């Protein structure tokens, strides 16, 4: 989990304060961040949305976006560690370039008027995000501490998979298949109502970065998944674009919440179709 937030960065709810803060940025950065579709601005937007959903409270969780529609699709913007996600600003992102994960920009480089000398730390999720980008060519990767994600892993203690079938919301998720020719996992459509959604569950570790090996193993072993659950911790979800990742995350959380209620009432998560 991220460390407590001690920073005094600007309140993102105040548009006036945000506009005033822009004057401390270089003209180049001012131009970048004036675009509402810039990945850094989208991270801020999603962080506030996810905070309202109780997915990234208490500085927990993280979001990263690869600039797939920009001039350099290898650029990845990552929210820092230990900041209140609902108050984050676009200039507080770390910028990394794939495939070598070269650090191009940190929020510690921006004028102190914007940070009040707060020392930003890279997200502990960074190596896990990088795994999703390299292994699945993702356009965005989301990590939340959703209570639904945590609870379902508790209910499935000792199990390595979450499975659910015959639920309409499953159709919001992609159908993926490993292509032997390209050696890549490719989207071939969407899951159908009668399909079984399978999400691997990995065990938590004391430090986030120590999850990297088990996350990579799950990604290799489950080519059909767009997410990995971390027991007693949360979930990682990725998609080909930021908006697809958002949709997948929302759909999965809906299914997790429903699955918890189904378990509580004794309804099997996977429908028996043999009778």
UniProtKB/Swiss-Prot annotation:
EC id: 4.2.1.109
Catalytic activity: 5-(methylsulfanyl)-D-ribulose 1-phosphate = 5-methylsulfanyl-2,3-dioxopentyl phosphate + H2O
Listed pathway(s): Amino-acid biosynthesis; L-methionine biosynthesis via salvage pathway; L-methionine from S-methyl-5-thio-alpha-D-ribose 1-phosphate: step 2/6
Taxonomy, superkingdom: Eukaryota
Keyword annotations of the record: Amino-acid biosynthesis, Cytoplasm, Lyase, Metal-binding, Methionine biosynthesis, Zinc
Cofactor: Zn(2+)
Cross-referenced InterPro entries: Aldolase_II/adducin_N, Aldolase_II/adducin_N_sf, MethylthioRu-1-P_deHdtase_MtnB, Salvage_MtnB_euk
GO term, biological process aspect, one: L-methionine salvage from methylthioadenosine
Any Pfam family the entry gives: Aldolase_II
Principal EC category: lyase
Main location: cytoplasm
Keyword Metal-binding assigned: yes
Active-site residue list: 168 (proton donor/acceptor)
Residues involved in Zn(2+) binding: 143, 145, 233
Compartments it resides in: Cytoplasm
Example GO molecular function: methylthioribulose 1-phosphate dehydratase activity
Record family assignment: Belongs to the aldolase class II family. MtnB subfamily.
Function: Catalyzes the dehydration of methylthioribulose-1-phosphate (MTRu-1-P) into 2,3-diketo-5-methylthiopentyl-1-phosphate (DK-MTP-1-P).
Protein name: Methylthioribulose-1-phosphate dehydratase
Organism lineage: Eukaryota, Fungi, Dikarya, Ascomycota, Saccharomycotina
Gene name for this UniProt entry: MDE1
